[in-house]
Regions:
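Intrinsically disordered, low-complexity linker/loop segments enriched in Gly/Pro
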Residues: 114-115, 137-224
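Boundary at the C-terminal end of the N-terminal hydrophobic targeting segment
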Residues: 32-37
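Alpha/propeptide regions of enzymes that mature by internal proteolysis
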Residues: 41-42, 46-52, 60-74, 79, ...
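Short, Lys/Arg- and Gly-enriched loop/turn segments at beta-strand edges
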Residues: 80-92, 138-148, 238-248, 338-339
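N-terminal secretory signal peptides that target proteins for export/translocation
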Residues: 1-17
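Bacterial N-terminal signal peptides
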Residues: 19-31
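Short, basic/aromatic beta-hairpin or loop at an interaction surface
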Residues: 39-53, 94-111, 198-210
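Conserved mixed alpha/beta catalytic, RNA-binding, or beta-rich assembly cores of soluble enzyme
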Residues: 193, 202-213, 222, 228-296
Length: 356
């Protein structure tokens, strides 16, 4: 459902009383940053149950909007697993936006953990095409987040048999994050969406949003920040693009299984390429080319990320395969994307400064 009416919340770290005042004001107030986010936007998807599907990618889903190549879409997203963990971590319900409560209260099928905006139908997109998603703008819908671990979860399941949660306060003016109950730590805010993907082939059915795959999905790649572009292969007509799983910050690996889960807004620009093909996703930042490897085996994920960069250098830069392989050995930086989603991720980053 598309509408031009939005909630916007100014942010404060001045305590519960201030948070209550700002939550009330959020019904009509608009921050300068979100005003910028609305500029040159073709479609807007405010946070609502109608614009969310919870925890899956599926080619049989009805799209919430149809766009053309070159259109921009503004959207608002609820953090993974909804509001319950925020409550358990000590965030007052008075700080929740009415739209957040509305989404949580609606009866809906929850296959996985991530409320995803969409799907977005892209006119003209066909199987074998490439979808380019430009991350134009990413910001905070609320100035708090949560992180923690489940019993026996994450990278060290035997070390931490219990569970723990921590709330985080986000200073949206200065771009810093503090961990409640822990003094002397300040984390740089680096918001990004952990899950961006298209529908899998119709015969594949419904895919849980937890693990990434050929449809992309839950990459949890902390380098896909504002200003980055993601390229994905299309598997069904219209592509059926979905996005969600907002993170305020994350380390390489996401070792507990969660980043700082946060509610974000974003603006994307979608470009359809009929003259390109891809087997696996790629990305590009202003400074780097990014290849990706996804596999339950970390070694195989690393091989895939390397192989995909070699393929990029051969196909896009015109290099001989052997030379491309050598260049990867001396200049490609492999990073662990995440270790905790079943299908592990490794991404390779190659500096654009190498090319004159």
């Amino acid at each position: 459902m598309i509408t031009r009416t939005h909630e916007r919340a100014p942010f404060s770290n001045q305590g519960t009383h201030a948070a209550l005042i700002f939550t009330v004001l959020a019904i009509t107030a608009v921050t300068a940053h979100t005003l910028v986010a609305q500029q040159n936007v073709t479609y807007e998807l405010p946070l609502s149950a109608e614009n969310i599907h919870w925890g899956f990618y599926d080619a049989s889903l009805e799209p919430v909007v149809t766009i053309r190549s070159g259109d921009r879409v503004y959207f608002e997203n609820l953090l993974a697993r909804g509001l319950e963990r925020l409550r358990l971590a000590g965030i007052s319900e008075r700080r929740f936006l009415p739209s957040m409560l509305n989404v949580e209260e609606q009866e809906t099928v929850r296959v996985g953990s991530h409320p995803l905006n969409g799907p977005v139908y892209v006119e003209g997109a066909e199987v074998g095409d490439v979808l380019e998603v430009r991350l134009i703008d990413i910001g905070f819908l609320a100035d708090y987040g949560v992180s923690g671990f489940l019993p026996g979860g994450g990278t060290l399941p035997m070390d931490f048999p219990s569970a723990a949660l921590r709330a985080f306060e986000i200073d949206t003016i200065n771009g810093t994050i503090t961990m409640t109950g822990v003094e002397g730590i300040e984390i740089p805010a680096r918001p990004f969406f952990g899950s961006i993907g298209v529908a899998p082939p119709l015969l594949r059915g419904r895919i849980n949003s937890t693990a990434p795959g050929y449809h992309v999905g839950n990459l949890d790649n902390k380098d896909l920040v504002e200003g980055t572009t993601l390229f994905m292969p299309v598997h069904v007509d219209g592509a059926l693009l979905s996005i969600g799983d907002g993170h305020a910050a994350q380390g390489d690996g996401e070792v507990t299984g969660t980043a700082i889960e946060a509610s974000l807004y974003g603006t994307i620009e979608v470009i359809l390429h009929k003259d390109r093909t891809l087997q696996w996703p790629r990305a590009e930042t202003p400074t780097h080319y990014i290849s990706m490897g996804l596999d339950p085996d970390l070694d195989e994920a690393a091989r895939m990320a390397t192989r995909e960069m070699v393929r990029f250098l051969v196909e896009d830069k015109g290099m001989e395969p052997g030379d491309a392989y050598i260049l990867c050995s001396v200049a490609l930086n492999l990073r662990i994307t995440q270790l905790v989603d079943g299908t592990k991720g490794v991404h390779g980053m190659l500096s654009k400064d190498l090319f004159r």
